[in-house]
Amino acid sequence: MNLSSLPFRLLAAAVALCAIAAPASAERIKDLAQVGGVRGNALVGYGLVVGLDGSGDRTSQAPFTVQSLKNLLGELGVNVPANVNPQLKNVAAVAIHAELPPFAKPGQPIDITVSSIANAVSLRGGSLLMAPLKGADGQVYAMAQGNLVVGGFGAQGKDGSRVSVNIPSVGRIPNGATVERALPDVFAGSGEITLNLHQNDFTTVSRMVAAIDNSFGAGTARAVDGVTVSVRSPTDPSARIGLLARLENVELSPGDAPAKVVVNARTGTVVIGQLVRVMPAAIAHGSLTVTISENTNVSQPGAFSGGRTAVTPQSTIKATSEGSRMFKFEGGTTLDQIVRAVNEVGAAPGDLVAILEALKQAGALTAELEVI
Protein backbone atom coordinates (compact mmCIF):
# COMPACT_ATOMS: atom_id res chain seq x y z
CA MET A 1 0.00 0.00 0.00
CA ASN A 2 1.31 3.44 -0.92
CA LEU A 3 0.96 5.36 2.34
CA SER A 4 2.32 8.57 0.80
CA SER A 5 -0.78 8.90 -1.35
CA LEU A 6 -3.24 8.01 1.43
CA PRO A 7 -3.96 11.62 2.57
CA PHE A 8 -4.61 12.61 -1.02
CA ARG A 9 -6.92 9.65 -1.55
CA LEU A 10 -8.95 10.57 1.50
CA LEU A 11 -9.17 14.19 0.33
CA ALA A 12 -10.11 13.16 -3.18
CA ALA A 13 -12.79 10.82 -1.89
CA ALA A 14 -14.25 13.57 0.28
CA VAL A 15 -14.28 16.03 -2.60
CA ALA A 16 -15.85 13.47 -4.91
CA LEU A 17 -18.57 12.76 -2.34
CA CYS A 18 -19.35 16.46 -2.09
CA ALA A 19 -19.57 16.68 -5.86
CA ILE A 20 -22.60 14.38 -6.18
CA ALA A 21 -25.27 16.30 -8.02
CA ALA A 22 -27.85 17.86 -5.73
CA PRO A 23 -30.64 20.33 -6.29
CA ALA A 24 -29.65 23.96 -5.80
CA SER A 25 -30.68 25.16 -2.35
CA ALA A 26 -32.02 28.60 -1.56
CA GLU A 27 -29.68 30.97 0.25
CA ARG A 28 -30.46 34.13 2.18
CA ILE A 29 -29.23 37.46 0.88
CA LYS A 30 -27.34 38.01 4.15
CA ASP A 31 -25.26 34.90 3.35
CA LEU A 32 -24.49 35.96 -0.23
CA ALA A 33 -23.82 39.69 0.11
CA GLN A 34 -22.96 42.46 2.52
CA VAL A 35 -24.46 45.91 2.85
CA GLY A 36 -22.26 48.55 1.26
CA GLY A 37 -20.43 50.67 3.84
CA VAL A 38 -21.10 48.27 6.72
CA ARG A 39 -17.61 46.99 7.50
CA GLY A 40 -14.94 47.00 10.15
CA ASN A 41 -12.03 49.43 10.22
CA ALA A 42 -8.44 48.61 11.17
CA LEU A 43 -6.87 50.32 14.16
CA VAL A 44 -3.18 50.34 15.08
CA GLY A 45 -1.11 51.73 17.92
CA TYR A 46 2.20 51.58 19.76
CA GLY A 47 2.70 50.92 23.45
CA LEU A 48 4.73 49.38 26.24
CA VAL A 49 4.22 46.09 28.04
CA VAL A 50 5.60 46.06 31.58
CA GLY A 51 5.89 43.51 34.37
CA LEU A 52 7.75 40.88 32.35
CA ASP A 53 9.87 38.39 34.27
CA GLY A 54 13.20 39.23 32.64
CA SER A 55 11.90 38.34 29.18
CA GLY A 56 11.53 41.88 27.83
CA ASP A 57 13.57 43.85 25.31
CA ARG A 58 17.35 43.96 25.54
CA THR A 59 17.48 47.75 25.62
CA SER A 60 21.06 47.93 24.39
CA GLN A 61 19.75 46.62 21.06
CA ALA A 62 16.37 48.38 21.17
CA PRO A 63 17.02 52.00 22.23
CA PHE A 64 13.52 53.10 21.23
CA THR A 65 12.12 51.08 24.14
CA VAL A 66 14.11 53.19 26.59
CA GLN A 67 13.12 56.38 24.78
CA SER A 68 9.44 55.41 24.93
CA LEU A 69 9.71 54.67 28.64
CA LYS A 70 11.39 58.04 29.27
CA ASN A 71 8.61 59.83 27.39
CA LEU A 72 5.96 57.96 29.37
CA LEU A 73 7.61 58.72 32.70
CA GLY A 74 7.94 62.37 31.68
CA GLU A 75 4.19 62.57 31.03
CA LEU A 76 3.64 61.14 34.51
CA GLY A 77 5.90 63.76 36.08
CA VAL A 78 9.00 61.60 36.53
CA ASN A 79 12.08 63.14 34.95
CA VAL A 80 14.89 60.82 33.84
CA PRO A 81 18.23 62.53 33.06
CA ALA A 82 19.08 62.51 29.37
CA ASN A 83 22.43 60.81 29.97
CA VAL A 84 20.85 57.90 31.86
CA ASN A 85 19.86 54.81 29.86
CA PRO A 86 18.25 52.21 32.14
CA GLN A 87 19.10 48.62 31.26
CA LEU A 88 15.68 47.06 31.55
CA LYS A 89 14.54 43.49 31.00
CA ASN A 90 10.93 43.71 32.13
CA VAL A 91 9.66 46.16 29.48
CA ALA A 92 8.85 45.47 25.82
CA ALA A 93 7.86 47.77 22.97
CA VAL A 94 4.80 46.41 21.20
CA ALA A 95 2.53 47.06 18.25
CA ILE A 96 -1.20 46.93 18.94
CA HIS A 97 -3.85 46.25 16.34
CA ALA A 98 -7.59 45.76 16.46
CA GLU A 99 -10.68 45.99 14.30
CA LEU A 100 -13.34 48.60 15.00
CA PRO A 101 -16.65 46.85 14.28
CA PRO A 102 -19.37 48.61 12.31
CA PHE A 103 -21.76 50.72 14.42
CA ALA A 104 -19.39 50.55 17.43
CA LYS A 105 -20.28 53.27 19.94
CA PRO A 106 -18.12 55.09 22.51
CA GLY A 107 -17.74 53.06 25.68
CA GLN A 108 -17.99 49.65 24.02
CA PRO A 109 -15.02 47.24 24.48
CA ILE A 110 -13.18 45.54 21.63
CA ASP A 111 -10.51 42.82 21.56
CA ILE A 112 -6.92 43.70 20.72
CA THR A 113 -3.78 41.83 19.64
CA VAL A 114 -0.37 42.82 21.02
CA SER A 115 2.86 41.88 19.18
CA SER A 116 6.47 42.45 20.17
CA ILE A 117 8.42 44.64 17.73
CA ALA A 118 11.89 44.30 19.30
CA ASN A 119 13.77 41.34 20.79
CA ALA A 120 11.57 40.40 23.74
CA VAL A 121 11.65 36.66 24.42
CA SER A 122 8.11 36.44 25.79
CA LEU A 123 5.20 38.72 26.67
CA ARG A 124 3.77 36.20 29.12
CA GLY A 125 2.62 37.80 32.38
CA GLY A 126 2.93 41.36 31.07
CA SER A 127 0.52 44.28 31.26
CA LEU A 128 -0.07 46.78 28.48
CA LEU A 129 0.01 50.40 29.59
CA MET A 130 -2.58 52.82 28.20
CA ALA A 131 -2.02 53.40 24.48
CA PRO A 132 -4.12 55.14 21.81
CA LEU A 133 -5.35 53.25 18.74
CA LYS A 134 -5.60 55.24 15.53
CA GLY A 135 -7.38 54.70 12.24
CA ALA A 136 -6.13 55.32 8.71
CA ASP A 137 -7.17 58.99 9.03
CA GLY A 138 -4.86 59.52 12.02
CA GLN A 139 -7.73 60.00 14.47
CA VAL A 140 -7.81 58.20 17.83
CA TYR A 141 -10.77 55.80 17.95
CA ALA A 142 -9.97 53.67 21.01
CA MET A 143 -7.72 53.44 24.07
CA ALA A 144 -6.06 50.13 24.93
CA GLN A 145 -4.86 48.79 28.28
CA GLY A 146 -4.91 45.51 30.19
CA ASN A 147 -3.25 42.21 31.07
CA LEU A 148 -2.06 39.99 28.23
CA VAL A 149 -3.18 36.43 27.57
CA VAL A 150 -0.28 34.60 25.89
CA GLY A 151 -0.67 31.05 24.63
CA GLY A 152 3.05 30.42 24.14
CA PHE A 153 6.05 30.14 26.44
CA GLY A 154 9.64 31.22 25.94
CA ALA A 155 12.87 31.36 27.96
CA GLN A 156 16.46 32.30 27.16
CA GLY A 157 19.71 31.52 28.97
CA LYS A 158 22.76 33.73 29.45
CA ASP A 159 24.72 31.67 26.92
CA GLY A 160 22.18 32.44 24.20
CA SER A 161 20.34 29.11 24.40
CA ARG A 162 16.60 29.49 23.96
CA VAL A 163 13.46 27.39 24.17
CA SER A 164 9.99 28.41 23.05
CA VAL A 165 6.57 26.80 22.72
CA ASN A 166 4.17 28.23 20.14
CA ILE A 167 4.58 32.02 19.72
CA PRO A 168 5.20 33.74 23.08
CA SER A 169 5.88 37.15 21.50
CA VAL A 170 2.21 37.70 20.59
CA GLY A 171 -0.73 37.95 22.96
CA ARG A 172 -4.33 39.08 23.12
CA ILE A 173 -6.38 41.14 25.53
CA PRO A 174 -10.10 40.34 25.39
CA ASN A 175 -12.07 43.59 25.71
CA GLY A 176 -8.69 45.29 26.01
CA ALA A 177 -9.66 48.56 24.33
CA THR A 178 -12.52 50.99 24.82
CA VAL A 179 -14.06 52.79 21.85
CA GLU A 180 -13.73 56.57 22.20
CA ARG A 181 -15.00 57.76 18.83
CA ALA A 182 -17.80 56.44 16.59
CA LEU A 183 -17.57 56.12 12.83
CA PRO A 184 -19.77 58.28 10.59
CA ASP A 185 -23.29 56.93 10.07
CA VAL A 186 -23.38 55.11 6.72
CA PHE A 187 -27.19 55.22 6.63
CA ALA A 188 -27.56 58.99 6.84
CA GLY A 189 -29.05 60.92 3.91
CA SER A 190 -29.21 58.19 1.27
CA GLY A 191 -32.21 56.86 -0.63
CA GLU A 192 -30.54 53.62 -1.70
CA ILE A 193 -29.10 50.53 -0.07
CA THR A 194 -26.18 48.86 -1.83
CA LEU A 195 -25.68 45.11 -1.67
CA ASN A 196 -22.27 43.75 -2.69
CA LEU A 197 -21.89 40.04 -3.46
CA HIS A 198 -19.06 38.13 -1.82
CA GLN A 199 -18.30 36.52 -5.21
CA ASN A 200 -18.64 38.10 -8.64
CA ASP A 201 -21.49 36.37 -10.49
CA PHE A 202 -23.90 37.91 -13.02
CA THR A 203 -26.39 35.05 -12.64
CA THR A 204 -26.66 35.58 -8.89
CA VAL A 205 -27.06 39.35 -9.36
CA SER A 206 -29.90 38.81 -11.84
CA ARG A 207 -31.64 36.33 -9.55
CA MET A 208 -31.22 38.62 -6.56
CA VAL A 209 -32.88 41.52 -8.40
CA ALA A 210 -35.77 39.25 -9.38
CA ALA A 211 -36.18 37.92 -5.82
CA ILE A 212 -36.21 41.43 -4.31
CA ASP A 213 -38.70 42.73 -6.88
CA ASN A 214 -40.90 39.71 -6.23
CA SER A 215 -40.90 40.43 -2.47
CA PHE A 216 -41.10 44.24 -2.46
CA GLY A 217 -42.55 45.15 -5.85
CA ALA A 218 -41.25 45.72 -9.37
CA GLY A 219 -38.53 48.35 -9.73
CA THR A 220 -37.33 48.07 -6.12
CA ALA A 221 -33.90 46.70 -7.10
CA ARG A 222 -31.58 47.21 -10.04
CA ALA A 223 -28.34 45.54 -11.06
CA VAL A 224 -25.31 47.83 -11.17
CA ASP A 225 -22.64 45.31 -12.22
CA GLY A 226 -21.60 41.72 -11.58
CA VAL A 227 -21.23 42.38 -7.85
CA THR A 228 -23.57 45.22 -6.86
CA VAL A 229 -27.34 45.45 -6.50
CA SER A 230 -28.92 48.80 -5.62
CA VAL A 231 -32.20 48.80 -3.67
CA ARG A 232 -34.53 51.81 -3.28
CA SER A 233 -35.14 52.59 0.38
CA PRO A 234 -36.73 55.26 2.58
CA THR A 235 -34.49 58.00 3.97
CA ASP A 236 -35.75 57.58 7.53
CA PRO A 237 -33.12 55.52 9.43
CA SER A 238 -35.72 53.54 11.37
CA ALA A 239 -37.60 52.59 8.20
CA ARG A 240 -34.32 51.66 6.47
CA ILE A 241 -33.44 49.27 9.29
CA GLY A 242 -36.85 47.62 9.04
CA LEU A 243 -36.40 47.25 5.28
CA LEU A 244 -32.95 45.71 5.74
CA ALA A 245 -34.29 43.25 8.32
CA ARG A 246 -36.74 41.93 5.73
CA LEU A 247 -34.33 42.27 2.81
CA GLU A 248 -31.51 40.18 4.26
CA ASN A 249 -33.86 37.22 4.78
CA VAL A 250 -35.07 37.09 1.17
CA GLU A 251 -34.05 33.73 -0.32
CA LEU A 252 -32.80 32.93 -3.81
CA SER A 253 -30.86 30.21 -5.62
CA PRO A 254 -27.35 31.51 -6.42
CA GLY A 255 -25.65 30.79 -9.73
CA ASP A 256 -23.28 27.86 -10.10
CA ALA A 257 -19.67 28.53 -9.19
CA PRO A 258 -17.28 28.66 -12.18
CA ALA A 259 -15.31 25.54 -13.01
CA LYS A 260 -12.01 25.90 -11.17
CA VAL A 261 -9.11 23.78 -9.98
CA VAL A 262 -7.09 25.22 -7.08
CA VAL A 263 -3.60 23.85 -6.47
CA ASN A 264 -1.35 24.61 -3.51
CA ALA A 265 2.09 23.88 -4.94
CA ARG A 266 3.77 23.96 -1.52
CA THR A 267 1.57 21.45 0.29
CA GLY A 268 0.32 19.43 -2.68
CA THR A 269 -3.32 20.15 -1.85
CA VAL A 270 -5.64 20.02 -4.86
CA VAL A 271 -9.30 21.10 -4.81
CA ILE A 272 -11.37 20.32 -7.91
CA GLY A 273 -14.74 22.02 -8.43
CA GLN A 274 -17.86 20.03 -9.23
CA LEU A 275 -18.27 21.48 -12.75
CA VAL A 276 -14.73 20.69 -13.94
CA ARG A 277 -14.69 18.71 -17.18
CA VAL A 278 -11.85 17.27 -19.25
CA MET A 279 -11.70 17.01 -23.03
CA PRO A 280 -10.49 13.74 -24.63
CA ALA A 281 -6.83 13.19 -23.65
CA ALA A 282 -4.34 10.39 -22.98
CA ILE A 283 -1.77 10.80 -20.20
CA ALA A 284 1.44 8.96 -19.31
CA HIS A 285 3.26 10.12 -16.20
CA GLY A 286 6.36 8.62 -14.60
CA SER A 287 8.76 9.77 -11.90
CA LEU A 288 12.51 9.67 -11.37
CA THR A 289 13.86 9.18 -7.85
CA VAL A 290 17.49 9.98 -7.02
CA THR A 291 18.89 8.70 -3.70
CA ILE A 292 22.26 9.87 -2.36
CA SER A 293 23.75 8.11 0.67
CA GLU A 294 26.93 9.11 2.46
CA ASN A 295 29.25 6.69 4.30
CA THR A 296 32.53 7.40 6.08
CA ASN A 297 35.56 5.11 5.69
CA VAL A 298 38.42 5.21 8.21
CA SER A 299 41.91 4.17 7.07
CA GLN A 300 44.08 3.13 10.02
CA PRO A 301 47.89 2.93 9.38
CA GLY A 302 50.00 0.09 10.73
CA ALA A 303 51.65 0.24 14.12
CA PHE A 304 54.87 2.28 14.28
CA SER A 305 54.54 3.17 10.58
CA GLY A 306 54.41 6.88 11.24
CA GLY A 307 51.26 7.29 9.18
CA ARG A 308 48.11 9.15 10.18
CA THR A 309 44.55 8.00 10.41
CA ALA A 310 42.63 9.15 7.34
CA VAL A 311 38.87 9.64 7.13
CA THR A 312 37.45 9.53 3.62
CA PRO A 313 33.81 10.02 2.60
CA GLN A 314 32.15 7.55 0.26
CA SER A 315 29.07 8.62 -1.70
CA THR A 316 26.58 6.25 -3.30
CA ILE A 317 24.16 7.63 -5.87
CA LYS A 318 21.21 5.56 -7.03
CA ALA A 319 18.60 6.60 -9.56
CA THR A 320 15.35 4.70 -10.06
CA SER A 321 12.65 5.43 -12.58
CA GLU A 322 9.16 4.18 -11.91
CA GLY A 323 7.33 2.79 -14.89
CA SER A 324 4.72 5.19 -16.21
CA ARG A 325 1.20 4.05 -16.89
CA MET A 326 -1.02 5.63 -19.51
CA PHE A 327 -4.66 6.36 -18.89
CA LYS A 328 -7.25 8.01 -21.09
CA PHE A 329 -9.91 10.63 -20.39
CA GLU A 330 -12.96 10.62 -22.61
CA GLY A 331 -14.75 13.81 -23.55
CA GLY A 332 -16.81 15.32 -20.71
CA THR A 333 -15.00 13.39 -17.99
CA THR A 334 -16.32 14.48 -14.59
CA LEU A 335 -14.66 15.11 -11.25
CA ASP A 336 -15.53 11.65 -9.95
CA GLN A 337 -13.92 10.01 -12.98
CA ILE A 338 -10.79 12.16 -12.69
CA VAL A 339 -10.32 11.19 -9.04
CA ARG A 340 -10.90 7.50 -9.76
CA ALA A 341 -8.43 7.45 -12.66
CA VAL A 342 -5.69 9.20 -10.66
CA ASN A 343 -6.19 6.88 -7.68
CA GLU A 344 -5.94 3.80 -9.90
CA VAL A 345 -2.43 4.70 -11.01
CA GLY A 346 -1.39 5.55 -7.42
CA ALA A 347 -0.45 9.14 -8.19
CA ALA A 348 0.78 11.27 -5.31
CA PRO A 349 -0.46 14.87 -4.88
CA GLY A 350 2.66 16.22 -6.58
CA ASP A 351 2.01 13.99 -9.58
CA LEU A 352 -1.57 15.21 -9.83
CA VAL A 353 -0.38 18.83 -9.90
CA ALA A 354 1.90 18.05 -12.85
CA ILE A 355 -0.90 16.19 -14.65
CA LEU A 356 -3.38 19.06 -14.22
CA GLU A 357 -0.87 21.64 -15.45
CA ALA A 358 -0.14 19.52 -18.51
CA LEU A 359 -3.87 19.10 -19.23
CA LYS A 360 -4.35 22.86 -19.02
CA GLN A 361 -1.45 23.52 -21.40
CA ALA A 362 -2.86 20.97 -23.84
CA GLY A 363 -6.25 22.70 -23.80
CA ALA A 364 -7.98 19.60 -22.42
CA LEU A 365 -8.93 21.08 -19.04
CA THR A 366 -12.07 23.20 -19.39
CA ALA A 367 -11.60 25.03 -16.12
CA GLU A 368 -9.54 27.78 -14.57
CA LEU A 369 -6.35 26.45 -12.98
CA GLU A 370 -5.30 28.56 -10.02
CA VAL A 371 -1.97 27.91 -8.30
CA ILE A 372 -1.61 29.42 -4.84
Swiss-Prot record:
GO CC, one annotated term: outer membrane-bounded periplasmic space
Species of the source: Xanthomonas campestris pv. campestris (strain B100)
Cross-referenced InterPro entries: Flag_FlgI
PANTHER family: FLAGELLAR P-RING PERIPLASMIC PROTEIN FLGI, FLAGELLAR P-RING PROTEIN
Source organism superkingdom: Bacteria
Statement: the UniProt record of this protein carries the keyword 4Fe-4S: no
GO-annotated molecular function: structural molecule activity
Role according to the record: Assembles around the rod to form the L-ring and probably protects the motor/basal body from shearing forces during rotation.
Name by which UniProt lists this protein: Flagellar P-ring protein
One GO process term, biological-process aspect: bacterial-type flagellum-dependent cell motility
Keyword GTP-binding: no
Chief location bin: periplasm
Complex and partners: The basal body constitutes a major portion of the flagellar organelle and consists of four rings (L,P,S, and M) mounted on a central rod.
Compartment annotation: Periplasm; Bacterial flagellum basal body
Family: Belongs to the FlgI family.
